Amino acid sequence: MPTLNYPDSSPLKPAELQVLRAQYEKEGDYVGIQTKFNYAWGLIKSNARTDQQEGVRLLSEIFRAAPERRRECLYYLALGNYKLGNYGEARRYNDLLLEKEPGNLQAASLGSLIDDKVSKEGLMGIAIVGGLALAAGIVGGLVFKGAAKRR
């Protein structure tokens, strides 16, 4: 995966993430939105897929429950979905952020990464479909040829 080129893009150290997790767990059923956001942010930055999934889930909860916090969730929802390979969702959140902040360089950079991934995967899909069609044509030709010899 291409890397994001700014200081905020590297994962937290395990001890740093543990501090956020401990605060989140300490607040239990009454976890504050800021605590939940901080923990989700740390999870999104992780290289572990399960952490990223949990981060996206927590940010989605904040996005739905706290309209006043939506703007700050958008970038990390886009980033988390990008890291998980959910490029359609990543683009949707990133585009919403760019509508609100057209000059946001991080979002513009992430948008380019999303577009590059979608293009590469689209070309890969075309190549796979083309290969399958070619294989089906060869098998069909061999079956047809074998049937013609039996007559």
Swiss-Prot record:
Renumbered ranges of TPR repeats: 71-104
Ranges facing Cytoplasmic side: 1-123
Transmembrane regions: 124-144
InterPro entries: Fis1, Fis1_cytosol, Fis1_TPR_C, Fis1_TPR_N, TPR-like_helical_dom_sf
Transmembrane helix as UniProt keyword: yes
Keywords, sorted A to Z: Membrane, Mitochondrion, Mitochondrion outer membrane, Repeat, TPR repeat, Transmembrane, Transmembrane helix
Disulfide bonds: none
Membrane topology: Single-pass membrane protein
UniProt-annotated location(s): Mitochondrion outer membrane
An example molecular function term from Gene Ontology annotations: molecular adaptor activity
Keyword match Mitochondrion: yes
Highest rank taxon of the organism: Eukaryota
Major location category of this protein: mitochondrion
GO cellular component entries: mitochondrial outer membrane; peroxisomal membrane
Pfam families documented for this protein: Fis1_TPR_C (PF14853), Fis1_TPR_N (PF14852)
Parts of the chain on the Mitochondrial intermembrane side: 145-151
BP GO terms, sorted: mitochondrial fission; peroxisome fission
CDD domains hit by this protein: Fis1
Family note: Belongs to the FIS1 family.
Purpose of the protein: Has a role in mitochondrial fission. Has a role in outer membrane fission but not matrix separation.
PANTHER family on file: MITOCHONDRIAL FISSION 1 PROTEIN, TETRATRICOPEPTIDE REPEAT PROTEIN 11 TPR REPEAT PROTEIN 11
Domain remarks in the Swiss-Prot or TrEMBL record: The C-terminus is required for mitochondrial localization, while the N-terminus is necessary for mitochondrial fission.
Entry protein name: Mitochondrial fission 1 protein
Gene: fis1
